[in-house]
Amino acid sequence: MSLSDKDKSAVKALWSKINKSADVIGNDAVSRMIVVYPQTKTYFAHWPDLTPGSTHIKAHGKKVMGGIALAVSKIDDLKAGLSNLSEQHAFKLRVDPANFKILNHCIMVVISSMFPKDFTPEAHVSLDKFLSAVALALAEKYR
């Protein structure tokens, strides 16, 4: 699925409104993922504290949203722009790519609850397409 110019503009516009809250969004999304999808805890078993908002959760949420920020900046070529992250997740971290979709859903839930006026139906569709494209780009090295 490719992103239209309209989708790209909508994602960039939404990102410009939410990027100041990226760390909070990341923390809340990762916390939500671990609570709602407990099977994802297996990737973080080496952390001493998996409670929502813990130091490790916050740090990982910040990393995740840093990756989303990178993706927004590389929106015209996500496959090339996220190549290093794809390689890291495929070969070093060995994350099942199905988990990207789970985290994407959690990110959208958090954004929609934090920014209800900005999360219009159009923004929702464009962000969903964008995050799906990010998941696809991250899964590229698994093939």
UniProtKB/Swiss-Prot annotation:
Organs and tissues of expression: Red blood cells.
Coiled-coil region: none
Binding site for O2: H60
Gene Ontology biological-process entries: hydrogen peroxide catabolic process
Keywords carried by this UniProt record: Acetylation, Heme, Iron, Metal-binding, Oxygen transport, Transport
Stored PROSITE patterns: GLOBIN (PS01033)
Domain Globin span(s) in chain numbering: 2-143
Modified residues (N-acetylserine): S2
Matching CDD domains: Hb-alpha-like
Assembly and interaction partners: Heterotetramer of two alpha chains and two beta chains.
Family, similarity comment: Belongs to the globin family.
Listed name of the protein: Hemoglobin subunit alpha
Annotated organism of origin: Pogonophryne scotti (Saddleback plunderfish)
